[in-house]
Amino acid sequence: MGINTVVLIRAGLGKWIASPFQCLLGKEDVYYPPVDLVEMFLTLADKYDMAFYFGMYDSGKYWQEGLFQKEIDLNMALIDEVWKKYGHHKSFQGWYLSQEISRRTKNMSKIYAEVGKHAKSVSGNLTTLVSPYIHGVKTDQVMAGDKALSVKEHEEEWDEILDNVKGAVDIMAFQDGQVDYNELYDYLVINKKLADKYNMKCWTNIESFDRDMPIRFLPIKWEKLLLKLDAARRAGMEKA
């Protein structure tokens, strides 16, 4: 099958943005980009018949500081501008809500809910995607001394989060690199169970880099990648 979906991980992070978005250039301290990468990616996705998902802007500060409405307002303005400028592309098939969380963090579901619903309303109900991560043994927080979530705790917290974002999120694609290989299947089974409960599609974000190494991030070896692919297959993931 090859590659049929391309996701822009973020429209920007902090000062760096992927295209000259006027709503960000006018309000945020960002650098002017030399190339319109969004137009380039969409044109190529059109050419090769791929589905393109546009990723939101991550301020790198507001939502971490609890200033959720600031993050929401920036992204709502971005959605309006992006859809008006790029919505004619046949490959523009959805939106990626790019703020990454692992648990009930500072009421983060508010961003998913409001931004997701706005994106869908502007674009004629295009698909929305999130890719959170599992709060497992390989997260920065746990390696710094926090406690990893058990499978049961993961299910309880994400049941609450998904209930809060009903109608705003269509696809859930958890990153798979923050738990050990022998634990992954159990978490994926819960992800699929929750996705089914809330009528969402369940993909998996298979990371092709290695979190076990002291350098961020070396390519993963095939044996590890195969273990993750097999766990995804057995758990019933719809796309990887």
Model-derived regions: residue spans:
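Glycan-processing catalytic domains of CAZymes
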Residues: 1-240
